[in-house]
Amino acid sequence: MTVLAPISTLAVPADEAFAALAVVKGELAAGHVVPYLGPCLFAQGSVSIPTTPEDLALALNAKAPVSGRIRGNLWAAAQFIESRRHRKTLTALMTEIFRAPMAPTALHHRLAGWRLPLIVDTWYDGTMRAALQESGRTDWGEIQGVTRVGEFREIWTRAYDASGAQVDLAAAASWTAILYKPHGAITPAANFLVSDSDYVEVLTEIDIQTPIPDVVKERRRKSAFLFIGARFHDQMLRIFARQIAKRSAGGHLAIAERALLARNEVRFLDEAGIELIDCPLVAAVELLIAG
């Protein structure tokens, strides 16, 4: 995992953090809280995929060298490859990087077992989908953000049922659980929002919520969000977190160690009204999956 600049702050006492987590766990299980998953969930052990935008940018650069000044900027590096080598090359490289499947963690399995109306997963892997499939459930489906490059119609998302077959977005209303992947994913169809051009129209429209499916807006309306393994040091990450959680019930929470957050992350949490549960991610996950 790429190391981000820490700041010096006072930590919340551990007992307060764990008491808060115990309450959140009950609300999660009851479907009153939307889990918002980030790739740092994988950073605790051996992984076969990049777990930060910076590491993904470097992985792309290793396969198709980009300009040195943008080497650590995912969105710009992806745009460089798309512009110089064609969109098909970028998609092929992303597919190669994320091809190796990640085994679902205990938290993924726990979330798959709860009857959650909505799960937001912001990375490109297919791990949460795999956990839902392994649960044996068929009452769920997935909505992914898709690129509009090469499209001549207004399209923001595609929907897939539990088997991976593409279906009409209207089918999502009947699903007990929706897995929402706003940036796309390797499975089932290798959809990726990753280059600057992918985000041009999305960022133009996202403030008025156009790219976010109506069924997602409806399911978040009475819920709070719990950010797990998510970072906010990059403006793109902050924009999506703010807009996806917009017009929901509020009372959002994020699990992270405050002393490891960058200054702009702390500022974002304060401005967005997201309360920080200040504890190690590993310890928090252990509590969430216990019992």
Kindly give the residue locations of the regions a language model identified:
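SIR2/sirtuin NAD+-dependent deacylase catalytic core
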Residues: 2-291
